[in-house]
């Protein structure tokens, strides 16, 4: 088991990005950005992937470029877990279709996992796990199978969980979680 010393290790922060914030460090339109969250942080941090402006949840920031590259490269197949609230009661055949793969305008895609969590009225909550990071992927997948996303939250990125982070806050990833993140990409 590897031990990472506090003063020698790179910085990895888990952020709960709120809806309405863009996943960049600057925005020409003046919208809230990730830079607003880390403005007082002594190190320069880079976002690992993105979440669209209408999606909330877990986003990682780091000063380790190699870690960021590996976490976002499809060959490492790092799973990302989303909870989506969609319109309608999801039919049983949708799971099979998503697991087998659907054709999107930028190529075929299959989810790693799909499960229905609950249905209340005309809203169904589903969990979707994918390892690719295409633009608005979960929203486009659910549109393709006929269930538009009403609300989308990323709850897990590899071994890192959102946990109880409030929107617009962050925590440092440490100890076993940090080691698991590096192990996931062979570093």
Question: What positions do the PLM features span?
Answer:
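Basic, flexible Lys/Arg- and Gly-enriched helix-loop patches that mediate nucleic-acid binding at interfaces
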Residues: 1-187
């Amino acid at each position: 088991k590897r031990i990472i010393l506090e003063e020698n290790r790179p910085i990895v922060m888990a952020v709960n990005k709120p809806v309405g914030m863009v996943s960049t460090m600057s925005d020409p339109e003046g919208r809230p950005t990730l830079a607003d969250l880390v403005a007082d942080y002594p190190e320069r941090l880079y976002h690992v992937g993105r979440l669209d402006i209408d999606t909330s949840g877990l986003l990682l920031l780091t000063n380790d470029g190699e870690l960021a590259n590996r976490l976002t490269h499809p060959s490492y197949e790092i799973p990302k877990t989303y909870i989506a609230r969609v319109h309608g009661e999801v039919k049983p055949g949708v799971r099979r279709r998503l697991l087998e793969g659907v054709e999107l305008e930028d190529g075929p895609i299959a989810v790693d996992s799909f499960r229905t969590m609950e249905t209340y009225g005309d809203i169904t909550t589903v969990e979707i796990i994918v390892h690719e990071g295409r633009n608005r992927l979960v929203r486009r997948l659910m549109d393709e199978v006929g269930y538009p996303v009403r609300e989308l939250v990323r709850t897990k990125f590899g071994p890192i969980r959102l946990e109880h982070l409030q929107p617009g806050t962050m925590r440092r990833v440490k100890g076993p979680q940090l080691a698991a993140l590096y192990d996931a990409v062979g570093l």
